[in-house]
């Protein structure tokens, strides 16, 4: 299987959204940029901030859309076309209501599961054949409270759990970049 050439973090732009649960994907790619000592650069034709990091012996593009979550596909579609990257070589990091804070899973292919960023991406691509990093943020318990939940800030304990999950994901990232997704999934999904 082909390795990763593009890692996308989903979230909403703007200072009022920086620390929200919905921006778990942004937190992941921001952590990669910081860890590798790189900087984001605005690329207006891609509707995103972009950076490059060196992982597992190769350069990987990072993309952080400046569009709102429900329009993320526009930026991703532009990036894939500009860099001539196949969707199967892309990892999209996003918040996941169905997992508690601290849980993180890799997945390939599938539907959007109600996640508006994934909904827009699959609509524009015409399929869901790309990798996802599903970062648990928990569920408020009632469907009516989902919007305020995802746009709310995690508690201190939730933040600690989410940060630990993102760290575990970054540890297995070299395997995924090298194309060993089974190995990355096994290592990430095995709780020690």
UniProtKB/Swiss-Prot annotation:
PROSITE patterns: PEPT_TRNA_HYDROL_1 (PS01195). It catalyses: an N-acyl-L-alpha-aminoacyl-tRNA + H2O = an N-acyl-L-amino acid + a tRNA + H(+). The active site is at residue 22. TRNA binds at residues 17, 68, 70, 116. The record marks 95 as: Stabilizes the basic form of H active site to accept a proton. Its EC number is 3.1.1.29. Hydrolyzes ribosome-free peptidyl-tRNAs (with 1 or more amino acids incorporated), which drop off the ribosome during protein synthesis, or as a result of ribosome stalling. This is Peptidyl-tRNA hydrolase. It comes from Xylella fastidiosa (strain M12).
């Amino acid at each position: 299987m082909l390795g990763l050439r593009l890692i996308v973090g989903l979230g909403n732009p703007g200072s009022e959204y920086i620390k929200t649960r919905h921006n778990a994907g942004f937190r992941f790619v921001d952590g990669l940029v910081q860890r590798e000592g790189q900087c984001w650069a605005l690329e207006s034709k891609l509707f995103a901030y972009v950076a490059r990091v060196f992982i597992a012996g190769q350069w990987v593009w990072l993309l952080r859309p400046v569009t709102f979550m429900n329009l993320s596909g526009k930026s991703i579609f532009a990036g894939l076309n500009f860099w001539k990257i196949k969707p199967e070589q892309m990892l999209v990091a996003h918040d996941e209501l169905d997992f508690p804070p601290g849980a993180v899973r890799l997945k390939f292919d599938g539907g959007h599961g109600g996640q508006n960023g994934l909904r827009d991406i699959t609509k524009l691509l015409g399929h869901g054949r790309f990798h996802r990093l599903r970062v648990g943020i928990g569920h408020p318990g009632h469907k009516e409270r989902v919007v305020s939940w995802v746009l709310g800030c995690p508690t201190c304990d939730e933040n600690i759990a989410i940060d630990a999950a993102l760290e575990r994901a970054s540890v297995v990232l070299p395997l995924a970049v090298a194309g060993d997704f089974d190995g990355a999934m096994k290592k990430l999904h095995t709780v020690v």
